[in-house]
Amino acid sequence: MTALDHPQPRPGIKNIAAYVPGRESAPGVEKIWKLSSNETPLGPSPAALEAVREASQHLEIYPDGSASKLRDAIAKAHGLNPANILCSNGSDELLALLAQTYLMPGDEGIYTEHGFLVYRIQILAAGATPVVAREKDERADVDAILAAVTERTKIVFLANPNNPTGTYLPMEEVKRLRSGLPRKVLLVLDAAYAEYVRRNDYEAGVELVSSNDNVVMTRTFSKIHGLAGLRIGWMYAPIHVVDAVNRVRGPFNVNAIAIEAGTAATHDKAHVERAVEHNETWRTWLAQELEKLGLRVTPSVANFLLIHFPENGSKTAEEADAFLTARGYILRRVTGYGFPHALRLTVGTEEANRGVIAALAEFLER
């Protein structure tokens, strides 16, 4: 059979590098600590788990196509108008829908040098051209983003905080970015890790969306809420953006269990605070211990750390990854993000955190 004997994808699709999730297993290793996907070590809210059990008794019924119960809960929690909220099958779906809605061949979409790989994928999937803005000190550079804007630019994706670096832009810098963009350019603020940030100069994007017609904020229940397996995301956006995206999103894109679990998780603020406290304590401890081992760590405000290894010799990131994996500690290689000499470590349970530091110390002392 030749290539012409079966249907072919449109030009450009096969040039897209598929997203590769963090690993979750290691051959021959019985006990695994998965520290590769920035999942919360505290798991979901007990209230969310109870909501899952109750909702699972009625799976023959289609979910509410507008996810109004979840939208109302989110709106109440954040002081927003539910009409400006759109829920989704994970925030990744929103990134795809926004690209599909606002990009076409000939357009350009901008993302930063070490930004989330899904941005590039969705820009290409829409037939548009991805444009990379250089970062400075492993942080988004507003001047570089603005310099990359052309008459063909239609969308700018900014992860704030960023994955995999854990760095962030203060709100004044994000405001400066918005002010410098043409009104026709949509600024997408991906705030997947917003709940973890405890900095006075940070704001996830609510203020900018509320006061502008070309800013969108996306959020997720996959991180601090511990509902990654249910795929729940949401967007706060101007009414005209919500209306446009609603025209292309699939019907019933948020399932019934996700709606109930997300609603319950939104109400359980105590669980979120416990997760924040755990993360603050152990992220600080991990960073200090890693630096004691002589490793450079990018300062992070999220629930993960980017660890830098020597570029040469026997203590490389690749060898560290193999050593740790053989002992059950699975971290994330970030070569695709422009960091071939680094590993990303999720803040885990106390057992996982202490264990991975001990294993790294053993690796470095060999």
Swiss-Prot record:
Record's catalysed reaction(s) = L-histidinol phosphate + 2-oxoglutarate = 3-(imidazol-4-yl)-2-oxopropyl phosphate + L-glutamate
Pathway(s) this gene product operates in, as recorded in its UniProt entry: Amino-acid biosynthesis; L-histidine biosynthesis; L-histidine from 5-phospho-alpha-D-ribose 1-diphosphate: step 7/9
Pfam family of the protein (one):
Aminotran_1_2
Give the N6-(pyridoxal phosphate)lysine positions (modified residues): K223
Q: GO biological process annotations for this chain's record?
A: L-histidine biosynthetic process
Q: Which domain of life is it from?
A: Bacteria
Q: Which cofactor does it need?
A: pyridoxal 5'-phosphate
State how it assembles: Homodimer.
Which HAMAP family did the record assign?
A: HisC_aminotrans_2
Descriptive protein name: Histidinol-phosphate aminotransferase
Give the species. Chelativorans sp. (strain BNC1)
Q: What is the lineage of its organism?
A: Bacteria, Pseudomonadati, Pseudomonadota, Alphaproteobacteria, Hyphomicrobiales
